[in-house]
A protein has these predicted regions:
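Minor-groove-contacting beta-hairpin "wing" of winged helix-turn-helix DNA-binding domains
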Residues: 60-69
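Short amphipathic alpha-helical interaction segments
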Residues: 35-50
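A short, conserved structural fragment
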Residues: 49-59
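Positively charged, polyanion-binding regions of nucleic-acid-associated proteins
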Residues: 1-17
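Short helix-coil junctions and helix-kink-helix linkers
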Residues: 26-38
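Short acidic, hydrophobic short linear motifs in intrinsically disordered regions
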Residues: 17-28
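Short, amphipathic alpha-helical interaction segments positioned at domain boundaries
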Residues: 72-95
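Exposed, interaction-prone assembly regions rather than primary DNA-binding/catalytic cores
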Residues: 89-113
Length: 113
């Protein structure tokens, strides 16, 4: 059993009304002999999400991680958590591309692709 298995098993029993924090997950992993920091817990969750595991989160007080139970759960998370980050990063990239083009007086577009 790996640390990610412990994390996933703990999250699978959680809902949006009863999420588990990364601190609790790190403590749980330690109880099984895995010395994971909260940052490493977040990384394990990020990797599981990339594998298609529908782990959701809420950042509010008392927040934490939980499993998606429906398409509505997933879409709410996607639209309030993921999408704003993607849009912000895309906006930042466009502004930096424009600034680089001005700064270096060249067509940045040609060099970016």
């Amino acid at each position: 059993m790996e640390a990610k298995d412990i994390i996933l098993k703990a999250i699978q029993h959680r809902t949006s009304e009863n999420p588990i924090s990364n601190v609790e997950l790190a403590q749980l992993c330690r109880s099984y002999g895995f010395n994971l920091s909260t940052e490493r817990v977040r990384e394990e969750i990020r990797l599981m999400r990339k594998d298609g595991v529908l782990i959701l989160s809420q950042a509010s007080a008392g927040g934490g991680y939980y499993m998606s139970r429906s398409m509505d759960d997933y879409l709410r998370f996607r639209n309030t958590n993921l999408l704003p980050r993607v849009i912000d990063m895309q906006d930042t990239m466009k502004l930096m591309d424009y600034a680089a083009k001005r700064e270096y007086k060249m067509d940045a577009q040609a060099r970016l692709f």
